Amino acid sequence: MKIDEVRGMTPDQLNEQLVALKKEQFNLRFQKATGQIEKTHRVDEVRKDIARIKTVLRAKQAQA
């Protein structure tokens, strides 16, 4: 997910996306622990996407 895509979202959309990514991160952690994960790079991608969303949410809250 690109930062421009994240900045274009509303706070409600960002919160929904954040919840979805946290669920995915939880599932990926279990897959990694059991050795079932195929795309290991996805763990890092999800973590960085969560950070991007949190950063943009924080910036939007500071503006309001």
Curated annotation (Swiss-Prot):
InterPro entries (alphabetical): Ribosomal_protein_uL29 (IPR050063), Ribosomal_uL29 (IPR001854), Ribosomal_uL29_CS (IPR018254), Ribosomal_uL29_sf (IPR036049)
Any one GO cellular component localisation term in the record: cytosolic large ribosomal subunit
Source species, domain of life: Bacteria
UniProt cross-references to CDD domains, sorted A to Z: Ribosomal_L29_HIP
Protein's UniProt keywords contain Transferase: no
GO molecular function: structural constituent of ribosome
Xref: Gene3D superfamilies: 1.10.287.310
The UniProt record lists the keyword Ribonucleoprotein: yes
GO-annotated biological processes: translation
One of the Pfam families matching this protein, by short name: Ribosomal_L29
Alphabetical UniProt keywords: Ribonucleoprotein, Ribosomal protein
Homology family: Belongs to the universal ribosomal protein uL29 family.
Protein name: Large ribosomal subunit protein uL29
Taxonomic lineage of the native organism: Bacteria, Pseudomonadati, Pseudomonadota, Alphaproteobacteria, Caulobacterales
Gene designation: rpmC
